[in-house]
């Protein structure tokens, strides 16, 4: 019986000491966080134009709608990849644009209005060349040159190829088909390189 009491007291002492040590371990340490880097989305076209004047960069515009399920899937699956997020933030101005917004958009000296027949804003209609499918990604070079629309949901690997093709200026040296065929993905393992042609490349 005495042995049992001593064992219980010893165990209690060890437990209390452990709690004290744990409490003193790092009282000023910040609480652990799982927060990941996110894409620095721009939602104002006016802000985009101001940023372009200050520091010209390439542009990625994510054309979406509130009802588009594949848009949400792309947000969840593609635009959360850490390497992709970092590359976009370093090399692009990333824009989220609701294609169905009804306010007037002022862009490059032109006004764009909501077009009921398309159920979309004229800004989206022009950049998507009237192909109103969602999601839709539009790439632009510095100073809004050469807008290139890419329709449909895109995986991390597909977006990696598009992003680096424009972001690394490979479009100056190779046709897109050649580039995508010989590209080795670095950001993820998955499907083979996309065969979707890039308009004008």
Can you say where each PLM-predicted feature lies in the sequence?
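Bacterial Sec-dependent N-terminal signal peptides
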Residues: 1-25
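Soluble non-cytosolic domains of exported or imported proteins
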Residues: 39-43, 58, 62, 78, ...
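A short beta-strand-turn-helix
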Residues: 40-59, 88
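Short active-site neighborhood of thiol/selenol oxidoreductases, capturing the structured segment around
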Residues: 55-69, 94
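Detector for the c-type heme attachment site
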Residues: 72-76
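Thioredoxin-like thiol-disulfide oxidoreductase module
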Residues: 82-84, 89-148, 156, 161-169
């Amino acid at each position: 019986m005495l042995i049992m009491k001593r064992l219980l007291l010893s165990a209690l002492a060890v437990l209390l000491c452990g709690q004290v040590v744990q409490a003193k371990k790092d009282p000023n340490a910040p609480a652990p966080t799982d927060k990941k880097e996110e894409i620095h989305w721009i939602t104002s076209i006016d802000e985009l134009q101001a940023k372009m004047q200050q520091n010209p960069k390439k542009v990625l515009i994510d054309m979406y709608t509130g009802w588009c399920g594949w848009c949400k899937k792309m947000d969840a699956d593609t635009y959360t990849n850490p390497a992709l997020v970092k590359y976009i933030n370093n090399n692009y101005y990333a824009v989220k644009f609701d294609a169905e917004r009804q306010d007037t958009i002022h862009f490059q000296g032109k006004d764009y209005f909501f077009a009921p027949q398309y159920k979309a804003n004229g800004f989206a209609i022009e950049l998507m060349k009237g192909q109103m499918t969602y999601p839709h990604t539009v790439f632009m070079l510095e100073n809004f040159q050469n807008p290139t629309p890419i329709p449909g949901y895109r995986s991390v690997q597909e977006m990696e190829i598009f992003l680096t093709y424009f972001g690394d200026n490979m479009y100056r040296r190779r046709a897109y088909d050649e580039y995508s065929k010989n590209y080795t993905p670095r950001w993820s393992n998955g499907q083979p390189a996309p065969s979707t042609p890039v308009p004008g490349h």
